[in-house]
């Protein structure tokens, strides 16, 4: 079985590592952790490198620990932040912790010999007193050492509260606690976490004379220079209530050709040979974008499940051609209804309305006059068939699965009517 570095380095997933990590991994599997700040009730794609590092750790025989920062979340990590985060209530944090754990279950197994574990650092941070903390942790760090950390230096001009200044000591205590309680010898995180990670290794070394290790992965930007995971609509979330599975799929499908090889290495478990084969296929026929399609299918299936992914793919085919509308199931049309303009009518209303009325109702036409002109130019369709007259009505037998009717204007403008 390959060790963690042997798995991650060829995929360019390692930015930095502490001395001696390779030698330690050569001795056998290791227990490692990643911390997640529970400032929201969902992870987003910007967290996925951390999640994948835990998944690879488990695949390499190690034991992953997910530390949800219920305690540190009440303080706030200054790393990479221009201003202080709002402090969350205990109830908000507990609710977010439960939601994040559920999402992580799609990436790591919580069963078996090296089952993943979830820990909330509030469980040990809430019980430690200030005097005890200063005695057992604070005395091992000089202020000069703490000021030298990039996470602090970047905030000196704008101002940093003592609360955030002390964050690195609290995270260091997390590492020390996990080393003692669970024999955890590795902390992983983004490259902006290097200072916090090394502070933890320093604390273990000074208090116990033991060696523990750190590993960081790169902060990811796209070829266009933008921060990965950000769109015009904001962050791309794993929670389907925040980012629909359809939009999630489209995010990956729209990956720039210059980024797709790297993202396949980062966010899938495909072998390097499989990735090379996809890229070779793409070079032969770039228009089909097989690499982006495989990336989108793989990540969406892992986050939302294979059934939802199949529905999303079928919904995409409806909008971009290549599928039989009559074969589309209710689940597929339900996906579409969440992504394109939609309206609901009763059976009696359907019997009274013409197709022109429906086109106006869903916003595909401003008036019946526009419908007449569009029909003359063969510019409207109903359920994939060119509309011959705006005065026609939709018969119950013409409805698609689930009582849907799909209206189309031109090549790219769609709307759904659902009969209830």
UniProtKB/Swiss-Prot annotation:
Keywords for the protein's UniProt record, in alphabetical order: Aminoacyl-tRNA synthetase, ATP-binding, Cytoplasm, Ligase, Nucleotide-binding, Protein biosynthesis, RNA-binding
Major enzyme class: ligase
Motif 'KMSKS' region, residue numbers: 227-231
One GO term describing the cellular component: cytosol
InterPro entries attached to this UniProt entry: aa-tRNA-synth_I_CS, aa-tRNA-synth_Ic, Rossmann-like_a/b/a_fold, S4_RNA-bd_sf, SYY-like_C, Tyr-tRNA-ligase, Tyr-tRNA-ligase_bac-type, Tyr-tRNA-ligase_bac_1
Catalytic activities: tRNA(Tyr) + L-tyrosine + ATP = L-tyrosyl-tRNA(Tyr) + AMP + diphosphate + H(+)
The keyword Ligase appears for this protein: yes
Known EC number: 6.1.1.1
Source taxon at top rank: Bacteria
Any one Gene Ontology molecular-function term assigned to this protein's record: tyrosine-tRNA ligase activity
Residues reported in the UniProt entry to bind L-tyrosine: 33, 167, 171
Subcellular localization: Cytoplasm
Phosphoprotein is among the record's keywords: no
Pfam families, alphabetized: SYY_C-terminal, tRNA-synt_1b
Motif ('HIGH' region): 38-47
Binding site for ATP: 230
One GO-annotated biological process of the protein: tyrosyl-tRNA aminoacylation
Domain annotation S4 RNA-binding: ranges: 353-419
Subunit structure, interactors included: Homodimer.
Function, as annotated: Catalyzes the attachment of tyrosine to tRNA(Tyr) in a two-step reaction: tyrosine is first activated by ATP to form Tyr-AMP and then transferred to the acceptor end of tRNA(Tyr).
HAMAP family, alphabetized: Tyr_tRNA_synth_type1
Similarity-based family: Belongs to the class-I aminoacyl-tRNA synthetase family. TyrS type 1 subfamily.
Protein name: Tyrosine--tRNA ligase
Gene source species: Anaeromyxobacter dehalogenans (strain 2CP-C)
High-level lineage: Bacteria, Pseudomonadati, Myxococcota, Myxococcia, Myxococcales
């Amino acid at each position: 079985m390959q060790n963690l570095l042997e798995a991650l380095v060829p995929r360019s997933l390692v930015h930095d590592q502490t001395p001696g990590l390779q030698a330690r991994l050569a001795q056998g599997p290791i227990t490692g952790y990643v911390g997640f700040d529970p400032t929201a009730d969902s992870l987003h794609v910007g967290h996925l490198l951390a999640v994948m590092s835990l998944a690879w750790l488990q695949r390499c025989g190690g034991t992953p620990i997910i530390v949800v920062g219920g305690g540190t979340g009440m303080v706030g990590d200054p790393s990479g932040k221009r201003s202080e985060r709002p402090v969350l209530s205990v109830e908000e944090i507990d609710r977010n912790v439960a939601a994040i754990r559920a999402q992580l279950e799609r990436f790591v197994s919580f069963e078996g010999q090296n089952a993943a574990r979830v820990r909330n650092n509030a469980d040990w941070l809430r019980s430690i007193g200030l005097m005890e903390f200063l005695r057992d942790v604070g005395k091992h760090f000089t202020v000069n050492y703490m000021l030298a950390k990039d996470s602090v230096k970047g905030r000196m001009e704008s101002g940093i509260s003592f609360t955030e200044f002390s964050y690195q000591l609290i995270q260091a205590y997390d590492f020390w606690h996990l080393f003692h309680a669970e024999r955890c010898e590795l902390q992983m995180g983004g490259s902006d976490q290097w200072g916090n990670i090394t502070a933890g290794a320093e604390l273990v070394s000074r208090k116990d004379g033991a060696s523990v290790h750190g590993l960081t992965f790169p902060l990811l930007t796209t070829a266009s220079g933008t921060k990965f995971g950000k769109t015009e609509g904001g962050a791309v979330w794993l929670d389907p209530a925040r980012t629909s599975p359809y939009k999630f799929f489209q995010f990956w499908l729209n990956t720039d050709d210059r980024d797709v090889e790297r993202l396949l290495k980062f966010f899938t478990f495909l072998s390097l040979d499989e990735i090379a084969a996809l890229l070779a296929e793409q070079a032969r026929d770039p228009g089909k974008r097989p690499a982006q399609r495989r990336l989108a299918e793989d990540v969406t299936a892992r986050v939302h499940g294979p059934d939802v992914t199949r529905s999303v793919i079928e919904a995409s085919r409806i909008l971009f051609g290549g599928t039989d509308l009559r074969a589309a199931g209710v689940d597929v049309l339900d996906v579409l209804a969440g992504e394109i303009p939609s309206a609901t009518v009763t059976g009696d209303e359907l019997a009274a309305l013409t197709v022109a009325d429906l086109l106006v109702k869903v916003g595909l036409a401003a008036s019946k006059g526009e419908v007449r002109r569009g029909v003359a130019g063969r510019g409207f369709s109903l359920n994939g068939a060119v509309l011959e007259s705006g005065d026609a009505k939709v018969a119950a037998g013409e409805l698609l699965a689930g009582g849907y009717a799909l209206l189309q204007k031109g090549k790219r403008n769609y709307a759904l009517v659902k009969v209830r």
